[in-house]
Amino acid sequence: VKSKMLAAFTAVTLVALLVAGCATPAAEPEPTTPPPAAEATATPEPEPEPEMGTTYKIGFGPDVTGGGANLGEPQRNWAEIMKERLEESGGIVGPDGVVHEVEIIVGDSESNPDVAASLARRYVDEDEVVALIMGSVTPISLAIAEVATEAEVPYISMASSLAIIADPDTGEMRPWVFKVAQSNGDVAQWQVERLTDLGVNSVCYMYENTGYGKDCYNNSSAALTDAGMENMFEGAFERTDTEFPQVPAIEAAGCDAVVIGAIPPGAANAHLAIRTALPDIPIIHGHGVCTTDFITAGGDAVESAEMPCSAVIIAEDIAADNPAKATWMDFKDAYEDYTGEPVSTFGGHAYDALYWVIEALETLPEGLSLAEQRAAVRDYIENNITDWPGTAGIFKLAPDDHYGLDYTSFTWFKVEGQKFVPFPEEEW
């Protein structure tokens, strides 16, 4: 048994050895190659905080209350929009890379010259503003112009009279005073052209008893007289009047057309009284009525009223190649989004004035004294606001012209279907 087990074991062993001899030898394991070492990444340097410089302050004081409120409220609205824009942008950057916050200090001139002058002095002396943007109407602006001139602070008025920027005796520009609203002299040129086209030989003139109304009358009556039209009647009224004893005199005068120089509500109330008495007589206005307040106050009575206005109120209909199109759309869209109301040409005056100052501030290096800042802003506006597309037109300021517009900044309109509708000369 033992010999059989040994023979079996031997046989199994021989077979195992034969199998092992025929097998392929196992491959030697290759050494493991370590992964390449990661390249050292430099820790990024944090971007340096921008250098912050002087905070610039602008004194902004439209007539939010009182007789000029229809003009001042839209102007205040734009100032609030501008404050939001400046906050979102983090301020402005000077030519040296220094960042400056811009603070717009909004007040109310209250349509009162004394209040306006006091507010201007506070802005200048206590708030240390670099510029003033104030005055929605002429008498307020004239009061502020005196303060600005004495303090040597650049001042931009949002009212229309040329007397604001030019000495009435010499005609010379007031060095520190500018304005953005179209002038009544340019309005008068449009009125002459329209009334001439209508074949008018005589006019009756109604105007509000304010600096604005008197400036309207002075410019229009002179231009109409020069054009050979007889002034049959002139009469003044208060801006808040609702009764107009002048109307019977207009009826008796027998004039061919009536011209009104006023803003709402007086302009609408006077129009209503005249239209009621003389349903067929042509009635034309100045640019003080280029606001929906005029249509709201006058209703159906102001249908067919005509006036010159800035085309910003129909910005979306203006050709794309118009150099002011982008400005008009920027203003119109932002204003209507913010207020939920139709765009106002008066708010546009605030747009133009604020961007003049902002553009000037962007050129100031850090380190200037307040007096140097004020002088530099004045110089920039006088010399660099040229071919500048604003809401009121293309401005071309110069040392001898602190206004920079002409009558071509207007488009002739009429009220139709309770809207302002363009009424170009080819349709007259």
Q: What positions do the PLM features span?
A:
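Signal peptide-proximal N-terminal region
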Residues: 51, 56, 78-104, 226-229
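Beta-alpha junction/loop-to-helix N-cap segments that form part of ligand/metal-binding clefts
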Residues: 70-77, 92-168, 180, 236-243, ...
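Ser/Thr-rich, Proline-interspersed low-complexity disordered segments
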Residues: 17, 21-49
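Segments of small-molecule ligand-sensing domains
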Residues: 334-347, 358-422
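Periplasmic-binding protein-like
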Residues: 123-136, 154-158, 204-207, 254-264, ...
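Extracellular/periplasmic Venus flytrap/periplasmic-binding protein
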Residues: 115-118, 163-164, 174-278, 349
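Extracytoplasmic "Venus flytrap"
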Residues: 52, 59-82, 107-113, 136-137, ...
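Extracellular/periplasmic periplasmic-binding protein-like sensory domains
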Residues: 274-351, 363, 420-428
